[in-house]
Amino acid sequence: MASASAQSAALSAEQAKVVLAEVIQAFSAPENAVRMDEARDNACNDMGKMLQFVLPVATQIQQEVIKAYGFSCDGEGVLKFARLVKSYEAQDPEIASLSGKLKALFLPPMTLPPHGPASGGSVAASLGLALP
């Protein structure tokens, strides 16, 4: 038997878009922007410190929004929301885009290893194209 909170947290794809947009908007609220900036400064672009400082703040910001939609106001609620969004990403490009924007707000940019002619990793070479 499903709990009442699990039933009320079931969102349609359209509802998920609305909630995602609200969560993204919450990150731009002045007080939340300050909290995130402070957390990022404390993390110094170190992935371990990002998990320690940035992720908890990002989780709290999300919790403040999603609790109005039936998700529990704890880490489990955020995980359930994330799983729900993930389940819609493949079917709905707008949800995938919003989800990517949300992740970009609290995950550090990933740097790719260099791919130059010296490493044999150029895009043209990988496609079998010869450049003049």
UniProtKB/Swiss-Prot annotation:
GO terms for cellular component: cytoplasm. The modification N-acetylalanine is found at residue 2. GO terms for biological process: post-embryonic development. Pfam families: P_C10. Keywords: Acetylation, Cytoplasm. It is found in: Cytoplasm. Belongs to the UPF0456 family. In brain, may be required for corpus callosum development. PANTHER family: PROTEIN C10. This is Protein C10. It comes from Bos taurus.
